[in-house]
């Protein structure tokens, strides 16, 4: 695997998307994008930004089904069906987007990946973790992030933030945000457990701080990794 895979994780309102975009701007402005370009094979961008769910054409349709409560009418989504839809989105995303870019040397910035499924469906929905790990293994073909930033925030504070932010124009009412507070507390514990289990990969960032402070912390960690990856 020639490229590097960086993931941004966290609960609702943690600021993942904001920080991913700030990292992309920083990479471009600081010259890293041009430096990485020297490692690219073929006609691929040096830095790719993407997300789950919704990083492919198929994924966009799955994303609306998963997140928009109006997409399925009055019919609720079974928890196992939800899990399988996330797995389907990931399988398509890995095979048609992530692997092709990584194999050509790109630096990939992704908004959510496997840790979200463990936290949301495993801890939040309390589904079987062994089953989730098996599905993740199938969907990812073994692809693991090189670096994950977990933006940790108190669920009540994060949910309050979501009411003030610019909403996804494709999602009328977010299904995940609508869950009870206990769900969000459980998934936060899931991320905490993952961070303890994988300290070499997952970095916890206190996300209640200002965007600028959080960005500086993330960029400081990433700068040292980039020096190692692209000497």
Curated annotation (Swiss-Prot):
Protein EC: 2.7.4.9
Positions of ATP binding: 10-17
Protein name, per record: Thymidylate kinase
PROSITE patterns, sorted: THYMIDYLATE_KINASE
A Gene Ontology biological process term: dTTP biosynthetic process
PANTHER family linked: THYMIDYLATE KINASE, UMP-CMP KINASE 2, MITOCHONDRIAL
GO terms for cellular component: cytosol
InterPro entries tied to this protein: P-loop_NTPase, Thymidylate_kin-like_dom, Thymidylate_kin_CS, Thymidylate_kinase
């Amino acid at each position: 695997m020639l490229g590097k895979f960086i993931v941004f994780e966290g609960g609702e309102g943690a600021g993942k998307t904001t920080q991913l975009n700030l990292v992309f701007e920083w990479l471009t402005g600081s010259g890293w994008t041009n430096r990485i370009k020297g490692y690219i094979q073929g006609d691929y961008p040096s830095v790719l930004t993407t997300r789950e769910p919704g990083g492919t054409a198929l994924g966009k349709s799955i994303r609306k089904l998963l997140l928009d409560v109006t997409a399925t009418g009055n019919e609720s989504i079974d928890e196992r069906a939800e899990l399988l839809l996330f797995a389907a989105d990931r399988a398509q995303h890995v095979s048609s987007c992530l692997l092709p870019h990584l194999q050509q040397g790109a630096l990939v910035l992704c908004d959510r990946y496997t840790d979200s499924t463990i936290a949301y469906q495993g801890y939040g929905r309390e589904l079987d973790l062994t089953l989730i790990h098996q599905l993740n293994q199938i969907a990812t073909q073994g692809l693991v992030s090189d670096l994950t930033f977990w933006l940790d925030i108190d669920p009540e504070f994060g949910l309050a933030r979501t009411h003030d932010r610019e909403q996804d124009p494709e999602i009328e009412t977010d299904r995940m945000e609508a869950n009870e507070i206990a769900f969000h507390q459980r998934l936060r514990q899931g991320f905490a457990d993952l961070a303890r289990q994988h300290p070499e990969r997952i970095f916890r960032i206190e996300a209640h701080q200002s965007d600028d402070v959080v960005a500086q912390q993330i960029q400081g960690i990433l700068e040292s990794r980039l020096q190692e990856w692209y000497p």
